[in-house]
């Protein structure tokens, strides 16, 4: 049985509102959700807040529909980047990113999109679905992101709110599919209210309109999401990796190494 995941629930203004969205996700059959904390540096006082804890939301998380296990609640950071300096917080040495299970970036220009695909240490690149894309997707950066294990995210909430936004969502999704061929795609809700959520199989059907095959549409809600989470774990683990260095030889060791094998045998 597939394990469905929604990696983008908007961090609501009130705890009660967020609780109701998570409860609806569990009722619809999602096994895990990520609360999305957005950092927008264009604001006068940009701030990356500490992610909300599961304990602050539920004493006991709601049980997933059709299963006996509670829903898993993850933490996600999305940085809206309109300038190269906004990527500084995404460095692997940044203590901020280690607080989150998933780190995403929303690049506003083609140059920033290229940098996110080829050089920036993130798990997800967000695709704008609310307006006509300001540039064309190109194969080299998209392929580079796929090779690095980075995923591209499409959100479906705008498509169910407004007919104009639906056209932009489908158009931008199809443009991306022409380049990536359905690889490394994630579909999330971006929901702020319970009624904006849709069941996993309904979302997979919507994925067909985005140009995905039936198999790829299902993967965009399940296996690809788990792969993105694994990428996030690896990113955090890599921060603490230590390098092993060959022990330097002492003069005595060097002397022994220089002796012929026959001479060593006589000594023994």
Q: What name fits each language-model region?
A:
Residues 1-35, 41-68, 94-98, 111-268:
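Charged catalytic cores and adjacent phosphate/nucleic-acid-binding surfaces used
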Residues 69-106, 110:
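Hydrophobic alpha-helical segments and helix pairs
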